[in-house]
Structures are given as C-alpha cells and as structure tokens.
Amino acid sequence: MQKFIIHKGIACPLEYANIDTDQIIPKQFLLAVSKQGFGKHLFHDLRYLDDKESVLNMDFNLNKKEYQNSSILVSFENFGSGSSREHAPWALVDYGIRAIIAPSFADIFKNNALGNGLLTIELAKDEVLEIVDELKKSQDKNIEISLLEKRVFFKDKIFSFDLDDFHRICLLEGLDNIALTLKHEAQIKAYEKNSKSFLV
C-alpha cells in the first residue's frame, strides 16, 4: 500500500450527495478479484454515455479537461453509501484517487477506503462548499493535504481534519491489514510458542 504523508494534486468537485457504491463501480464489473483494472470503470454510468465506454459524458466533471488527472475528489454528504463492496475503493485507487473530501462518509466505505490507502477527510459542510465554489472559479485546482499535520491547504485557506491514530499510522507507513500483521509476526510467533495447546 502506498504511503500517504503529504499529497498535492488536482481536486475535482463532484456535487452529489449520497454517491453509492453502485455508482462508484456498477455490479457488472465486480467479477474480478484482483484490485487492478477497476479504474477504467469508475463512475461508469456518469462518465460514459454508452455501455461500451466509448462515448464520454463531457458534462461529468472528471471528463473535463481542467479536471483530468485529478487525484482528489470533493463531494457531498454520505459518500460511499449502499453495499459494502470493497471494489469501490479499489476502483478509486486504481483510477488514481488518493483522497476524498466530504462532510460525511458511509461507515463501511470509510473503513474499506482507509484500509486500501484511500484517505477520507471529513470537513464541515460549509467548508466543503467553500472549496467546491473556489475550485469551479479558479484556474489552479491543486489542493495539498498533509496527513502529518492533519490539514488541507487550498489557496490561502487551511482546513483541519481529524483521523483516528490507528488509520493515520497505517496510512503514514503504508500498511494494509496484511502488512500490519506481518509487522508483528515475531510477537505473534512468540505468543503461539508460549501458549498452551488445547484440543477442541
């Protein structure tokens, strides 16, 4: 998992509330079990005008020239609602999204996202609206995020956010659940060696 310490990138506003996991990655693309290859299907029904993904919907912000190569999304309430599919953060990460800023996230999506290296940042609704408004009228779409400081830097404004220590450390060190377990492999083996065996 890629470390997240400081990231600066183009931010794209998605002015929708309740973006659900089926909108993020529709069910017909869930056959694969690898984390790679989902990015091209991200927001399929919003990004494309046809099922073959050959005609782009140019009214959708991610398809607009000024938001190409976006690595940060700024959206509205309850991002990631719906089913618990882990493919949703896989698709976002595979597309190149490193962070999402919103007033709130669905709990399961948030945990899945953080576990896959995708930073979820909760800001007050008025702060999100301020960022969205500035993104739409400014030529400079770049936002800087410091996970070390737990701050978002945009123009001359600084927005502070919170994140629990466990997920913050995992992101700073680039540790997913497997890597975190392996980090404590010696302690686990020592515990197993010193523990009594019981027949079940």
Curated annotation (Swiss-Prot):
GO terms for biological process: L-leucine biosynthetic process. It catalyses: (2R,3S)-3-isopropylmalate = (2S)-2-isopropylmalate. GO terms for cellular component: 3-isopropylmalate dehydratase complex. Keywords: Amino-acid biosynthesis, Branched-chain amino acid biosynthesis, Leucine biosynthesis, Lyase. Its EC number is 4.2.1.33. Gene3D superfamilies: Aconitase, domain 4 (3.20.19.10). Transmembrane segments: none annotated. Disulfide bonds: none annotated. Pfam families: Aconitase_C. It comes from the Bacteria. Pathway: Amino-acid biosynthesis; L-leucine biosynthesis; L-leucine from 3-methyl-2-oxobutanoate: step 2/4. GO terms for molecular function: 3-isopropylmalate dehydratase activity. InterPro entries: 3-IsopropMal_deHydase_ssu (IPR004431), Aconitase/3IPM_dehydase_swvl (IPR015928), AconitaseA/IPMdHydase_ssu_swvl (IPR000573), IPMI_Swivel (IPR033940), LeuD (IPR050075). Coiled coil: none annotated. Catalyzes the isomerization between 2-isopropylmalate and 3-isopropylmalate, via the formation of 2-isopropylmaleate. Belongs to the LeuD family. LeuD type 1 subfamily. Heterodimer of LeuC and LeuD. This is 3-isopropylmalate dehydratase small subunit. The gene is leuD.
